[in-house]
Amino acid sequence: MSSSFHHQPVLPQQVLEALAELPDEGVLLDATVGGGGHSSLLLDVHPGWQLIGLDQDPAARAAAAQQLERFGERVQLVASNFAAYTPDQPVVAVLADLGVSSHQLDVPERGFSFRADGPLDMRMNTEGDGETAAALIDRLEENALADLLFHYGEERLSRRIARRLKTEGPWDDGERGTAALAYAIAGCYPPKQRHGRIHAATRSFQALRIAVNDELGVLETLLNDAPNWLEPGGRIAVISFHSLEDRLVKNRFKADERLRVISRKPLIASEQEAEANPRARSAKLRVAERLSAELEPAQ
């Protein structure tokens, strides 16, 4: 499983620089360890650091175990969503890469991509009993589905798409998958808009993935809890990939009295990285530093 997990870390130099001046010894909590790319870079340049790596995706944990094997007992991998975890000791840094990995997109069985047919799943945690995308579409009323597509995907044709999906359902019957869903969504667009640079189904697939995994809800939990995990002077670094996440991170960092924002504007990929790794084009890194340990969470 791990051998098929390919995940090139985005903004590697920016992450290293953001966490460069932290203490020589401490614990790094990688809230989305993925394939272990960011963590391996940080453990290399901080030989006194230990790692707690979280991921609810079993394929990601297997890949991380292989990537980080050379660090031995410095590494602890935990099967957990970061919203359900609390470290038992202060940490010097918290890192979260909120993007879907290349592996998750490239494996049709995961149901994240419309570029190859697969089941309408979209769950990050395939070992759990959470609701699939197909079940979610079937369960929601048309208006609720339209609201979901609009708010989570910023899809301007959300009403039209929701009406078509409910008309053509049920989707949780094992007969149709991601290709059929993408075809139905694209059919709601005028012919000239169906084959642009951004696929017509992109926003709807994003919205369904966010809803299935409660991505904004668990991010809210992380942003509320993580400052309490940090040592004074420790840093939290969050990489987001769409405006909903970035806006949430920006506003919470700014409003949280426990934190000092390190950079007013997000750090983004260089032209060279964006060309070499298209996934990095939409990546934004925001960093904040922990102030006094006595302050309570922002409400």
From Swiss-Prot:
State the disulfide connectivity: none
A Gene Ontology MF term for this entry?
rRNA (cytosine-N4-)-methyltransferase activity
User: Where is it mostly found?
Assistant: cytoplasm
What residues does S-adenosyl-L-methionine bind to?
36-38, 55, 82, 97, 104
Name where it's found.
Cytoplasm
Against SUPFAM superfamilies, the record matches this protein to: Putative methyltransferase TM0872, insert domain (SSF81799), S-adenosyl-L-methionine-dependent methyltransferases (SSF53335)
User: What reaction does this enzyme carry out catalytically?
Assistant: cytidine(1402) in 16S rRNA + S-adenosyl-L-methionine = N(4)-methylcytidine(1402) in 16S rRNA + S-adenosyl-L-homocysteine + H(+)
Q: Name one GO cellular component term.
A: cytoplasm
BP-aspect Gene Ontology terms: rRNA base methylation
In terms of Pfam families, this protein maps to: Methyltransf_5 (PF01795)
Query: Any idea which UniProt keywords this protein has?
Result: Cytoplasm, Methyltransferase, rRNA processing, S-adenosyl-L-methionine, Transferase
User: EC number(s) on record?
Assistant: 2.1.1.199
Functionally, this protein is described as follows: Specifically methylates the N4 position of cytidine in position 1402 (C1402) of 16S rRNA.
Q: Which PANTHER family match?
A: 12S RRNA N4-METHYLCYTIDINE METHYLTRANSFERASE, S-ADENOSYL-METHYLTRANSFERASE MRAW
> Which family is it part of?
Belongs to the methyltransferase superfamily. RsmH family.
What is this protein identified as? Ribosomal RNA small subunit methyltransferase H
Record gene name = rsmH
